[in-house]
Amino acid sequence: MSSTHSNNVGHPQSSPQGPLTEQQRAQQQYQIFENSLPKVSQSVYQMLLNEMVPLAMGIERQISGDVISSDSNVTSENGNINNMIKRLKIEEHHTVDIIRSHNLIHELYKADEEEKEKVLARLRNIGFQIGLKLSELLIFSNNPNLKFKEMDLLLIMKFICRDVWKQIFGKQIDNLKTNHRGTFYLLDYDYRPIQSFSLEEDAKNEELKMIEPFLEIPVGIIRGVLSSLGYSSEEVICLASFIDRPTDRPKTAFPKGVSFHVQVTMPQ
C-alpha cells in the first residue's frame, strides 16, 4: 500500500495574534508530527485487523497438526513452542492448504476450550505488541522524559480513550466510566472493525460468540499501553463484552456496542 500525506503539510498558515504559549507550540508540533505519519486505507486496515482472527486459528491448527503427526516419543525439550515453530517452515514446492477465513472462524467457535484459549492468547499478544509500539510512537518518541506512572491513572485511561483509540480506530472511545478505585469501563458503541458485520438486533448468542474473538486484539492493545507505562500484566485485568447501544444513537448494521472492563490493582 502506498502512503499518502496531507496536502496541507508545508504550506504557510497565518499565525494567531500574539506569541504562542508553550502549550500551543507543543500542540502545533504534535499536529505536524501526526500529519507527517503515512496514511493507509481505513477499509484495508480494518480488513487486516479482522484477518488476524482466522490467521491465529490457522496457525494453531497447523501447530496442532504438526504435533499430532510428530513422533509420539518426542521429548518435552524437543516439543517446546520454538521447535514447533521451526517445523512450520514452508519448504520449496511445499503445498499449503488454503482455508477460507469464515471456515476458520467457525472452526474456532467449535474448538475446545484449551485450543480456543491458545488462539485468544495469540490475538491478545498481537494487540499487546501493537500497544507497546503505539506508546513508543505517541509518547516516548516525542518526549522520552514523560513519566505516566507519576500521573493519575484516570489521565492514563483518558489517553487510551482519546489518543490511542483515535490513532488505531479513527475515533475516540464514546464513554469512560470509573469508580476511581482502579475499575474502568471503556464503552465503544461503534467499534469500527466489526461494523461491517451485519446482525439482527435479536442476534442469537451463538452469532455473538463467533464475533467475540475479534475483541481480543483491542484488549491486548489496552494491556500493552498500560504495560509500557509501568503497569505489569499481574496488575491489570482487561475483558471485553457486548452491550446494548443507547437508544438515541443511529442504527448500524452491527447492533451491539462493546464494553472494555479494565481493572488495575492500585498500590497500597
From Swiss-Prot:
Pfam families: TRAPP. CDD domains: TRAPPC6A_Trs33 (cd14944). The modification N-acetylserine is found at S2. Keywords: Acetylation, Autophagy, Endoplasmic reticulum, ER-Golgi transport, Golgi apparatus, Transport. GO terms for biological process: endoplasmic reticulum to Golgi vesicle-mediated transport; intra-Golgi vesicle-mediated transport; macroautophagy; positive regulation of macroautophagy; protein localization to phagophore assembly site; protein-containing complex assembly; protein-containing complex localization; retrograde transport, endosome to Golgi. Disulfide bonds: none annotated. Residues 1-27 are annotated as: Disordered. InterPro entries: NO_sig/Golgi_transp_ligand-bd (IPR024096), TRAPP_component (IPR007194), TRAPPC6/Trs33 (IPR037992). One of its GO terms (cellular component) is trans-Golgi network. It is found in: Golgi apparatus, cis-Golgi network; Endoplasmic reticulum; Preautophagosomal structure. Its main location: Golgi. The keyword NAD does not apply. Component of the TRAPP I, TRAPP II and TRAPP III complexes which act as guanine nucleotide exchange factors (GEF) for YPT1. TRAPP I plays a key role in the late stages of endoplasmic reticulum to Golgi traffic. TRAPP II plays a role in intra-Golgi transport. TRAPP III plays a role in autophagosome formation. Required for sporulation. Has a role late in meiosis following DNA replication. Part of the multisubunit TRAPP (transport protein particle) I complex composed of BET3, BET5, TRS20, TRS23, TRS31 and TRS33. Part of the multisubunit TRAPP (transport protein particle) II complex composed of BET3, BET5, TRS20, TRS23, TRS31, TRS33, TRS65, TRS85, TRS120 and TRS130. Part of the multisubunit TRAPP (transport protein particle) III complex composed of BET3, BET5, TRS20, TRS23, TRS31, TRS33 and TRS85. Belongs to the TRAPP small subunits family. BET3 subfamily. This is Trafficking protein particle complex subunit 33. It comes from Saccharomyces cerevisiae (strain ATCC 204508 / S288c) (Baker's yeast). The lineage of its organism: Eukaryota, Fungi, Dikarya, Ascomycota, Saccharomycotina.
